Amino acid sequence: MMNWTIKRFDELTLDELYALLQLRNEVFIVEQNCVYNDLDGKDQPAWHLMANEEGKLVAYTRILPPGVSYTDPAIGRVVTSSLKRRSGLGRELMKRSIEACEKLFGKISITLSAQVYLQSFYESLGFIVAGEEYLEDGIPHIKMSRKPSW
């Protein structure tokens, strides 16, 4: 059974912090072969949405308040364990992240920086392209935005 939790940075246990940094490192740095500084100073003001299964973190997003990365709230560091890919967990993770944004900040636009190969996935969740393609840490990205659902 999947256990979902959302916490502020100062509410995370040391084990939770270690697990989310480990998952982000495994996927974004090792698996994607992308050397970058994951610790960017944005974890502290963020909300951290975590999915645990049998005591192991298997999916995670970082939800940033308005004004941290963009004018709008932002969803970032979207990650699922390689063992859980193609199971629908990523879609569930994003749906819960959108719901969390709406609960925390009201029904306002949400922004994210998507890896280009995932553009259609985010479009299926109501996001639209909001800028030109650009390189972030050597990987093609595109800014996307989702208008509030009324």
Regions found by a protein language model. Give the residues of each.
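Conserved beta-strand in the GNAT
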Residues: 50, 56-66, 72-74, 79
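Conserved GNAT acetyl-CoA-binding A-motif
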Residues: 94, 101-114
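A conserved beta-turn-beta hairpin within the catalytic core of GNAT-like acetyltransferases
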Residues: 66-75, 85, 104-108, 138-140
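Short amphipathic alpha-helix that is part of the acyltransferase structural core
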Residues: 1-48, 52-56
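Conserved acetyl-CoA-binding loop-helix of GNAT-fold acetyltransferases
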Residues: 80, 86-99
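A short beta-turn/loop motif at secondary-structure boundaries
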Residues: 39-44, 67, 135-136
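C-terminal "cap" of GNAT-fold acetyltransferases
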Residues: 115-116, 135-150
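Conserved active-site alpha-helix within GNAT-family acetyltransferase domains
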Residues: 116-132, 137
